[in-house]
Amino acid sequence: EVKWGQKLAGLPILSPEESLTHRPDCVCLCVLDPERAAQMESQLRSLGYDGPLLNPGALRIFDARAATMRMLAEQIAELDIQGCAAELGVYRGEFAALINAALPDRPLHLFDTFEGFQERDLARERNLELSGARAGDFSGTSEIEVRLNLPFPQNAVFHPGWFPDTFHGCEELRFAFVSIDADLYDPTAAALPLFWERLCPGGALLIHDVYSGQFKGAGLALREFCASRSILAT
């Protein structure tokens, strides 16, 4: 709502109600998250739109993020790089399941509130206009659901709750692979030094949403972190 009336790539940003006054022949749901796509479809249908919908997220054949993770996992195994795997921002566990399958012999530490975004992480998002995130977004998950998605659930260690509080007790861990998909600035900024300082030589951090227009905080946190340590992110 805060972006209505503004422009993106020269195109006006309209409310769903106003956009339908233009009688579109087709509506494109320009999100990759299936839950958000379903919410958008439901909203459009409730407003009376009965035309065709194009969902690019459902058409993805090649997932560059998953392919990159598998390539890194293969290198970690081939080079016998020591350490655990971890993910911050698990949601329903789809990517965690891929990590679990690619590194089947490693403990996999999973950090998530499992209750969606927390209000305490949203002040900076609003003040800097980093996202339109709301408390409770991505709450449609549970630890049980994630565990059922994992091919090797016996290797999973769950850390439910607010990050970085949930990192307490993990200070002695060392990591070979870490996925950071927290979306927001505050948890991403908190996670980067904690995992970087515990990354084994040859290990990898994979950061999601670095160039996202929806969640700008992850990229901002990464740029600030790299600048402070003279690190080149690739």
Regions found by a protein language model. Give the residues of each.
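Low-complexity, intrinsically disordered regions enriched in charged/polar residues
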Residues: 34, 63-66
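Short, charged/polar "capping" segments at the starts of alpha-helices
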Residues: 2-8, 34-40, 119
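Glycine-rich, N-terminal phosphate-binding loop of Rossmann-like dinucleotide-binding domains
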Residues: 31-32, 182
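S-adenosylmethionine/decaboxylated-SAM
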Residues: 52-63, 70-74, 78-234
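A solvent-exposed beta-alpha-beta segment
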Residues: 1-31
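Short, conserved catalytic or adaptor-binding loops enriched in Gly and charged residues
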Residues: 6, 45-46, 147-152
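Internal alpha/beta domain cores that form substrate/cofactor-binding pockets in large enzymes
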Residues: 12, 16-22, 35-57
